[in-house]
C-alpha cells in the first residue's frame, strides 16, 4: 500500500528531467557532484563504451556533463562551440580533453523505496544503501569533425582541458598510425600532422597520469579529399562577385565568393570549349572540386561523364561555393547561402572564362540540384542586364524549380530534439546549418518555421497544417524566380531523377517509425513516432511525436511534443510523391555519433523520401504532385529525360548520360520533344552485332561509330529504325560512340565492345 501511495505521489509531482530542483537534495549524497539523471542521456555515455570519439560525440557528452554538474565547474556549452567556430579564423583545429566521474541512480533504488519524493516534489534518500552507480569518463577529440586539407594544424590549449576529478595529467601524446612512435603534445603550442588518406582518418591519443595509469582514446577526423594524380586541374582560383547581394535578415550586402578549378580537355589542353559544372546544396562545404567532379561518375565501371566530354575536346570548369568570411566574425556558408548571391559569383566566373577562352565555341552549363537554380538565375540575370553569357546549352539536373521537400515530420522531430529540453548538440548543427540555412528556407516547400507557435522555438501551431514555406524566404524567392523565367538565349534541357509514371516512394501517411523506443539509460527512454504526410484531403494527421519518459516503477512521460499535418484535396503529401530520392541518414549526417539518433535511423520502415518532386525538376505546374509525365506535359524545357523508376537525387545512369551527351555533342534540331528513357535503347556491351530499339520511327538515318581517338570507324546511310533493329559490325574491343542522325531526331550514345 505504501508503494502505491508513493507511486501516485511521484506521478502527480513529476514535471520534467530538466527541473533540477527535483534533484537538489541528492547533491549532498553525491560523491562526484555530477548526477546524470538530471539530463536526458542522448550520448549513452554511462551505458555504452564507444570505440571512436568523434568531435560531435565529445561535444554532446560535454553538454550533458556541464548541465548535470551540481557545482557548474565547466563553462557553458556555448563557450566550447565558440572555440570550435573560431577554428575557421585561426586556421587550426582545437583539441579538447574531458575527464570526469558521474553518477546515475540505480534502478532498484526506486523499486525498494530507497529514493522517493517529498512534499516539495524533491527526491530524497530514505536508507543508507548505495543508490548511485559511478561511471568514469575519459574523452579526447578534435572539436572540428572535418578538414579539406591533409596537412592539419592542431592545438591543445590549457583552457580546453576539463577535469572534474582528482587525477593529474603528466603527459599527452598523439599519433595517426598505430605503427608510429608517439608524439608528445605541448600544451598551448600548435603542431601539424599529415594524413595520407581521405575519408574518415584515425587519431590516437594517450593520456598519462601521475599515478602511473594511462588512458588510450581513439578519435577520428574526416578528410574531404584532394586532387588525384590522374585528374589534376590546370587552375585553382578564388573568385569574388562584383555584384553584391543582401539577403533577408542581413544588415548589409556582401560580395559572394567561390572557388573554381579548370580541368582542361584531353585533346589539345586549350581552354576553348567550356562546360561549367556547379556545386549544389552543400552545407559546411563538404565537397571540394574533385568531389564535385566525381558527381559525374556513373555505372559500375568507373565511367565519368566529365572524362568522356574531355576526350571530345571539352573543358570542365567546376565552381564550388565554400565557407568564407567577408568581414570580421562573419562566416558565410556558401554551400547553403542565398541562391542569388551564389548566382552573382557564377556571373563573374562566366565573364572571366569568356575573356580567357580561345575561339568562338559557346559555353555549356550543367547545374545539379541547387546548382541548377543558381545557374538558371545567373544566366537569366545576365540576359536581363545586357551581359553576354555566350552560352548555348543549359542542362538542369534534378533541380527544384518549383521547390524541394524534406518531410515535415523529421523537421519537427530534429528541431525539437535539438532546441527543446533535450539539447541535442549534434542535431543542433543539422538544424542550424542544414534545415535553417538560407538556401533551405528558399527552396523547401514545407518548412518547420512556417508552423511554429508565436514565441516558440519548437512547438507547432495546430491551425497551420498545410505545407507552408519559411516566412520571408520561400515565397519571395519563388516569386522572383517565376517572374524572371528561364534563360531565353540558351537551349534549356532537364534531367529528372523522379519517375514519369507516378511511382510512389512508400505511401502517403505511412509510419516511418511507429511508437519506436530508444532506451537512453535504465531510467530514461524516448518514444518516437514519424509518419509521411497524409493522403489528399486528410487533415490533423500526426506526422511527428517525441515523448521523453522516466522509469519510476512505471514509465512516465515527462515532456513531449507533437506535430500534425494536412494535405490539400488536390494531392497527397510530398513525402511519398514521385521524385529524386534522399536518404534520411544522409540528411542527418551532421548528427553522426549520436547513439540515440543512430538507433532510430537504423530502424526506419523506409529510409528514403521524395526530395525533388518530378514535377519540380521539370518545372511542370500541376496541383497534383503525383500526375504522370508524358509528351502532353507542358514544361519550359526543350527536351527532358525522365526515368520510369525513382532514383536517388543527382544519380547519373547510362540513360541520362546518353541524353546529356546527345545534348552536349550534337547541334539541336529545330523542333524537339521531351525524351523519356524508353525512346531509344542500345544493348551494351556488344560483340559483333549492335541491338537497338526505337519506340518511334527514325527515317533516313545515318549511323556512325567513332572510336576513343575521335576517328570514324563505321558509317551506314539511309536506314529506317522502328522497333527492334540489328546492325552487324566488326570492331576491336574498346570504347566507342555511336551517332544516329535521322530526319526526326539525333542521338549519340556510348558503345562498349568486348
Language model regions located:
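C-terminal outer-membrane/trafficking sorting elements
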Residues: 674-754
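Serine-dependent carboxylesterase/thioesterase catalytic core
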Residues: 343-467, 478, 500-544
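Bacterial Sec-dependent N-terminal signal peptides
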Residues: 1-21, 671, 735-737, 748
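Loop/turn elements at helix/coil->beta-strand transitions in domains of secreted/extracellular proteins
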Residues: 270-275, 281, 311-317, 358-363, ...
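C-terminal catalytic-base region of ester-bond hydrolases, centering on the histidine
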Residues: 28-124, 480-669
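Catalytic nucleophile-loop/oxyanion-hole region of alpha/beta-hydrolase
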Residues: 326-345
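Short, surface-exposed "cap/lid" segments of acyl-processing enzymes
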Residues: 250-321, 325
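Extracellular/lumenal mature domains of secreted and surface-exposed proteins
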Residues: 19-249, 663-668
Amino acid at each position: 500500500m505504501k508503494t502505491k501511495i508513493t507511486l501516485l505521489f511521484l506521478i502527480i509531482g513529476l514535471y520534467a528531467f530538466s527541473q533540477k530542483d527535483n534533484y537538489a537534495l541528492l547533491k549532498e549524497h553525491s560523491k562526484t557532484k555530477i548526477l546524470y539523471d538530471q539530463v536526458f542521456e542522448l550520448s549513452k555515455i554511462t551505458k555504452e563504451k564507444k570505440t571512436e570519439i568523434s568531435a560531435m560525440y565529445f561535444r554532446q557528452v560535454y553538454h550533458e556533463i556541464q548541465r548535470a554538474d551540481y557545482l557548474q565547474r565547466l563553462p557553458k556549452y556555448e563557450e566550447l562551440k565558440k572555440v570550435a567556430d573560431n577554428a575557421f579564423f585561426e586556421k587550426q583545429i582545437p583539441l579538447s580533453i574531458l575527464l570526469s566521474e558521474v553518477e546515475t541512480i540505480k534502478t532498484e533504488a526506486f523499486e525498494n523505496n530507497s529514493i522517493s519524493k517529498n512534499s516539495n516534489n524533491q527526491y530524497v534518500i530514505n536508507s543508507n544503501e548505495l543508490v548511485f552507480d559511478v561511471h568514469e569518463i575519459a574523452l579526447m577529440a578534435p572539436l572540428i569533425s572535418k578538414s579539406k586539407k591533409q596537412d592539419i594544424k592542431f592545438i591543445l590549449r590549457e583552457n580546453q582541458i576539463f577535469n572534474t576529478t582528482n587525477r593529474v595529467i603528466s603527459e599527452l601524446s598523439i599519433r595517426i598510425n598505430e605503427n608510429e612512435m608517439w608524439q608528445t603534445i605541448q600544451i598551448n603550442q600548435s603542431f601539424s600532422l599529415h594524413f595520407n588518406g581521405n575519408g574518415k582518418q584515425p587519431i590516437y591519443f594517450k593520456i598519462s597520469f601521475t599515478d602511473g595509469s594511462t588512458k588510450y582514446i581513439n578519435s577520428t577526423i574526416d578528410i574531404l579529399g584532394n586532387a588525384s594524380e590522374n585528374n589534376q586541374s590546370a587552375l585553382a582560383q578564388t573568385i569574388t562577385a562584383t555584384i553584391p547581394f543582401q539577403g533577408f535578415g542581413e544588415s548589409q550586402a556582401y560580395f559572394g565568393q567561390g572557388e573554381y578549378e579548370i580541368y582542361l580537355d584531353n585533346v589539345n589542353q586549350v581552354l576553348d570549349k567550356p562546360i561549367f559544372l556547379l556545386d549544389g546544396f552543400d552545407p559546411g562545404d563538404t565537397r571540394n572540386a574533385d568531389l564535385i567532379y566525381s558527381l559525374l561518375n556513373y555505372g559500375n565501371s568507373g565511367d565519368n561523364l566529365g572524362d568522356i566530354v574531355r576526350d571530345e575536346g571539352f573543358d570542365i570548369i567546376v565552381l564550388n561555393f565554400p565557407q568564407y568570411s567577408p568581414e570580421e566574425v562573419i562566416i558565410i556558408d556558401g554551400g547553403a547561402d542565398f541562391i542569388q548571391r551564389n548566382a552573382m559569383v557564377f556571373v563573374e566566373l562566366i565573364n572571366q572564362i569568356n575573356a580567357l577562352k580561345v575561339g568562338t565555341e559557346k559555353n555549356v552549363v550543367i547545374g545539379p540540384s541547387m546548382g541548377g537554380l543558381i545557374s538558371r538565375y545567373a544566366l537569366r540575370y545576365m540576359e536581363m542586364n545586357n551581359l553576354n553569357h555566350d552560352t548555348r546549352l543549359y542542362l538542369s539536373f534534378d533541380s527544384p524549380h518549383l521547390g524541394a521537400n524534406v518531410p515535415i515530420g523529421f523537421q519537427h522531430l530534429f528541431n525539437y530534439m535539438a532546441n527543446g529540453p533535450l539539447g541535442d548538440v549534434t542535431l543542433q548543427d543539422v538544424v542550424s546549418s542544414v534545415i535553417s540555412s538560407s538556401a533551405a528556407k528558399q527552396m523547401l516547400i514545407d518548412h518547420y518555421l512556417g508552423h511554429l507557435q508565436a514565441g516558440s522555438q519548437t512547438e507547432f501551431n495546430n491551425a497551420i497544417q498545410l505545407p507552408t514555406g519559411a516566412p520571408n524566404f520561400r515565397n519571395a524567392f519563388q516569386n522572383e524566380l517565376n517572374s524572371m523565367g528561364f534563360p531565353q538565349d540558351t537551349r534549356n534541357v532537364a534531367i529528372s531523377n523522379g519517375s514519369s509514371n507516378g511511382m510512389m516512394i512508400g505511401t502517403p501517411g505511412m509510419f516511418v517509425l511507429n511508437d519506436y523506443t530508444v532506451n537512453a539509460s535504465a531510467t530514461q527512454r524516448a518514444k518516437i513516432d514519424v509518419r509521411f504526410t497524409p493522403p489528399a484531403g486528410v487533415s490533423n494527421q500526426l506526422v511527428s511525436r517525441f515523448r521523453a519518459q522516466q522509469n519510476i516503477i512505471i514509465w512516465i512521460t515527462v515532456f513531449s511534443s507533437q506535430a500534425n499535418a494536412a494535405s490539400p484535396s488536390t494531392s497527397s503529401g510530398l513525402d511519398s510523391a514521385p521524385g529524386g530520392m534522399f536518404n534520411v541518414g544522409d540528411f542527418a549526417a551532421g548528427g553522426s555519433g549520436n547513439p540515440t539518433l543512430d538507433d532510430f535511423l537504423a530502424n526506419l520502415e523506409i529510409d528514403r523520401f521524395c526530395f525533388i518532386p518530378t514535377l519540380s525538376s521539370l518545372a511542370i505546374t500541376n496541383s497534383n504532385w503525383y500526375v504522370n509525365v508524358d509528351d502532353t506535359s507542358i514544361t519550359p524545357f526543350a527536351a527532358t529525360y525522365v526515368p520510369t523508376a525513382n532514383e536517388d537525387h543527382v544519380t547519373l545512369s547510362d540513360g541520362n548520360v546518353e541524353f546529356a551527351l546527345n545534348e552536349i555533342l550534337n547541334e539541336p534540331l529545330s523542333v524537339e520533344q521531351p525524351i523519356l528513357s524508353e525512346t531509344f535503347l542500345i544493348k551494351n556491351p556488344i560483340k559483333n552485332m549492335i541491338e537497338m530499339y526505337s519506340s518511334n520511327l527514325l527515317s533516313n538515318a545515318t549511323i556512325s561509330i567513332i572510336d576513343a581517338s575521335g576517328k570514324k570507324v563505321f558509317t551506314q546511310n539511309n536506314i529506317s529504325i522502328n522497333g527492334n533493329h540489328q546492325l552487324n559490325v566488326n570492331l576491336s574491343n574498346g570504347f566507342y560512340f555511336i551517332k544516329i542522325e535521322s530526319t526526326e531526331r539525333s542521338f549519340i550514345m556510348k558503345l562498349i565492345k568486348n
